[in-house]
């Protein structure tokens, strides 16, 4: 590697809002606080929420359905 062009890496502690802590190397020199990590993210934990798209469509139709029907009739 060329001298003087690469940033210095430091070992830092990353702290998640769930309380999980781990060490990593980064160009940052101070601890890092994050909101989501692999211990609490739904993709990694398998506890994903299923979005009720049918309920959203029904809610949209209830709210705007009358207006859309009036436009279709004219």
From Swiss-Prot:
Keywords (A to Z) from UniProt: Metal-binding, Ribonucleoprotein, Ribosomal protein, RNA-binding, rRNA-binding, Zinc
Biological process according to GO: translation
Organism per entry: Nitrosomonas europaea (strain ATCC 19718 / CIP 103999 / KCTC 2705 / NBRC 14298)
Chain residues that bind Zn(2+): 16, 18, 37, 40
Assigned protein family: Belongs to the bacterial ribosomal protein bL31 family. Type A subfamily.
Protein name: Large ribosomal subunit protein bL31
The organism's taxonomic lineage, starting at the top: Bacteria, Pseudomonadati, Pseudomonadota, Betaproteobacteria, Nitrosomonadales
Cofactor dependence: Zn(2+)
Cofactor note: Binds 1 zinc ion per subunit.
Molecular function terms, GO-annotated: metal ion binding; rRNA binding; structural constituent of ribosome
Domain of life according to the entry: Bacteria
Stated role: Binds the 23S rRNA.
Keyword hit for Hydrolase: no
Subunit-structure text: Part of the 50S ribosomal subunit.
InterPro entries: Ribosomal_bL28/bL31-like_sf (IPR034704), Ribosomal_bL31 (IPR002150), Ribosomal_bL31_A (IPR027491), Ribosomal_bL31_sf (IPR042105)
GO cellular component: ribonucleoprotein complex; ribosome
The keyword Ubl conjugation belongs to this UniProt entry's keyword annotation: no
NCBIfam families named among the record's database cross-references: L31, PRK00019.1, PRK00528.1
Cross-referenced HAMAP family: Ribosomal_bL31_1
């Amino acid at each position: 590697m060329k001298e003087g062009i690469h940033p210095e890496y430091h070992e830092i502690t990353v702290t998640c809002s769930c309380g999980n802590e781990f060490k990593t190397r980064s160009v940052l020199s101070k601890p890092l606080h994050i909101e989501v990590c692999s211990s609490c993210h739904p993709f990694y934990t398998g506890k994903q929420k299923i979005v009720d798209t049918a309920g959203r469509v029904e809610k949209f139709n209830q709210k705007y359905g009358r207006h859309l029907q009036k436009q279709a009739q004219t």
